[in-house]
Amino acid sequence: VPVTGPGLVRKSPTYLADPNFPLFMRWSYVPKLLPWLIKYLSFANESDTRRISQGLTTIVGDSLEQHKALTAQTKAAKWVQSSNYSFAYADRAAFNADAFGWQLRKEAGFIPDLIEGRAVQEEEPILGFGTQLLAVLKGHGFILNPGSYVQDLVCVLKELGGKFIQAEVKDFDLSGGKITAVDTNIGRMHCDKAIVSSGIWSKPLMQKLGLHVPLEAERGYHIVFEQPSQKPNNPMMLAAGKFVATAMDQGLRCAGIVEFGGLSEKKSKAPLQLLRRKVQEVFPKLSFASEQEWLAYRPAPTDSLPYIGELSASGVFTAFGHHHIGLTGGPKTGRLVADMIVGHHPNTDIRPFDPMRFKRGK
């Protein structure tokens, strides 16, 4: 379900004025952000939200199976964990207020089991009594340690004969509209196919190819509570704080918050302070040895749909702009792009992800 739901335009001023709502803006960045923001908010209506949700479902609807298939019989498989996924609400009224989001999830085939009252704490003892309803989705999963997972995937690539080269891309060489080489800080790499898959940093690479994509950095804040006294049994979204709590290899990771402020490396204090307050509210008995803060840059297209496809038969393919779901949708995206590269027509409708869609006025 995308962030741009019905009512966002009307509610945004209230959200920004509320220090307890997990939406922040670096006001000095607003003039640069404004063209993107206007387009972004134009999709905050029922029909577009439903269309976007349907598109995203094709990328993440079977993500657990996709990750398991990708890692089968490899050292990376140990990081893929099966689990339930819960949405935690203060009460039935708070759950009902999210009715449109649940309607979209049900249309996508995700039907929750509802747990209420004291049974909530029996299901998840870490939760305080301020949480009186859990909406539980079964058959989901998570990655126990994303960093180690990706490192192991690189090892698998090498074992299969692939090469991993880290370099800074300077430009692309095209002849007759076809890719012939990628220019980097360590030399020119000749190729007849290339994939742009660099998150928010894909935007300047696309500009080198003559395409200006509406993409902004949505800054997300994470805190890992190391050696926690309690952990949730399954990953859960805390509706009141708009953050996800997951028991991971490093500790209890609480991730969420939205801040628009570009690619500044400086962390803002207010989002982290709010996240700590919300964690304390919902997990009142939690204690921990130490904590680690993390700031990430989510690549956010104006229409919340990733850019997946080929740029005008150039041999250059795109796979970026996954917003909050990059790791989740990675395997399916990779399979789609791999099929396109070898000339197989994907059995998934990829038109919603066309990287040329905004150039054509969509």
Please identify what each model-predicted range represents.
Residues V1-F43, D171-I179, G187-G315:
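Active-site substrate-recognition segment that forms the wall
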Residues L34-C155:
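Rossmann-like flavin
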Residues L56-S63, S198, P271, L275, ...:
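Hydrophobic/aromatic residues within well-ordered alpha-helical segments
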Residues A69-Q81, E159-K163, L211, F283-A289, ...:
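Surface-exposed helix-capping loop/turn segments at secondary-structure junctions
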Residues Q73, V156, K208, L336, ...:
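Active-site catalytic microenvironments for nucleophilic, acid-base chemistry
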Residues A93, I200-W201, K332:
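Alpha-helix/helix-capping structural signal
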Residues P112, A239-A240, Q280-K362:
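C-terminal catalytic lobe of FAD-dependent flavoproteins
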Residues L114-E124, F142, K163-T180:
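A conserved short coil-to-beta-strand element within the FAD-binding core of flavoproteins
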